[in-house]
UniProtKB/Swiss-Prot annotation:
Listed result of changing K47E: Decreased interaction with UFL1
Complexes and interactors: Interacts with UBA5 (via C-terminus). Interacts with UFL1. Interacts with UFM1. Interacts with KIRREL3.
Keywords associated with the record: Disease variant, Isopeptide bond, Ubl conjugation, Ubl conjugation pathway
Record: disease: Neurodevelopmental disorder with spasticity and poor growth: An autosomal recessive disorder apparent soon after birth or in early infancy. NEDSG is characterized by axial hypotonia, delayed psychomotor development, poor feeding, failure to thrive, peripheral spasticity with hyperreflexia, poor overall growth, and microcephaly in most patients. Additional variable features include contractures, facial dysmorphisms, and ocular movement abnormalities.
Cross-link Glycyl lysine isopeptide (Lys-Gly) (interchain with G-Cter in UFM1) mapped to chain: K122
One of the GO BP terms on file: regulation of type II interferon production
Identification of the protein by name: Ubiquitin-fold modifier-conjugating enzyme 1
Effect ascribed to mutating F121A: Decreased UFM1 transfer
Amino acid sequence: MADEATRRVVSEIPVLKTNAGPRDRELWVQRLKEEYQSLIRYVENNKNADNDWFRLESNKEGTRWFGKCWYIHDLLKYEFDIEFDIPITYPTTAPEIAVPELDGKTAKMYRGGKICLTDHFKPLWARNVPKFGLAHLMALGLGPWLAVEIPDLIQKGVIQHKEKCNQ
């Protein structure tokens, strides 16, 4: 894992107990409850730390997730749609988060706007199955990716703040 601040944030996210994916019907319902509880706690912790940076919701089955994330850079808010599907082999396989608006704008992204998490995040996820869930995916996957990629894309002029585009 990264620095002490990241460790502290992750230590405050409840770990999950149910090792179940979408194919596991009844157990999947239990896993989804744990996922929601973990996400709610993570969002509450972020709000209390004045670090609120995403919203997520899912379809009724809990297999397709979508929402928004945002990144503040030079006091400007950059907002992006996010989406991902729960793999059939979840939780053994981590979901792949897509930021469709950024598709093709960075080398650290796969076709379809899926962010690259293979080097750092996926080995960590694999060591922590089934304890890690979607809150951990956001905290250790998307969050650090945004922190590295968005300032770089802004500096290179690849993305611009919406207000600057309208002027």
